[in-house]
Regions:
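Ribonuclease/tRNase effector modules and their secretory precursors
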Residues: 1-113
């Protein structure tokens, strides 16, 4: 069935609905993972809404979303989100998209030019 515990859902620039669960958010901001993301949740949403994506070659269900920001801490300049695409069955027995964030982090990406 469709997962519960959704924190929020956004639509990417390609028309896909993507959600983040409370469990995944807790994982992302845990001290051993990416606690620096905690105050940048809106940036994560923006990266999903406006960022470019790339399909992972070894797992075609996995996409990497990336979007630049000029006011991130230290020397990083992008927010990256990993999203798994799939399907689920809703309460009416219909197939529905099930696309969710697995993790997110900052990254420095050299810009061309």
């Amino acid at each position: 069935m469709v997962s519960s515990g959704k924190r929020w859902t956004v639509q990417d620039r390609y028309g896909n609905s993507i959600y983040l669960t409370q469990e995944r958010w807790a994982h992302i901001i845990a001290g051993t993972n990416h606690p620096e993301m905690e105050i940048h949740e809106e940036y994560l949403k923006m990266a999903l809404k406006k960022g470019r994506r790339r399909q992972e070659p070894l797992n075609p269900r996995k996409y990497r979303y990336c979007h630049p920001f000029d006011d991130l801490p230290d020397d990083v300049n992008h927010v990256v989100a990993i999203v798994m695409f799939g399907f689920d069955i809703d309460e009416r027995g219909q197939t529905v998209p099930n696309n969710f964030v697995t993790t997110a982090f900052f990254k420095h990406i050299w810009l061309k030019g």
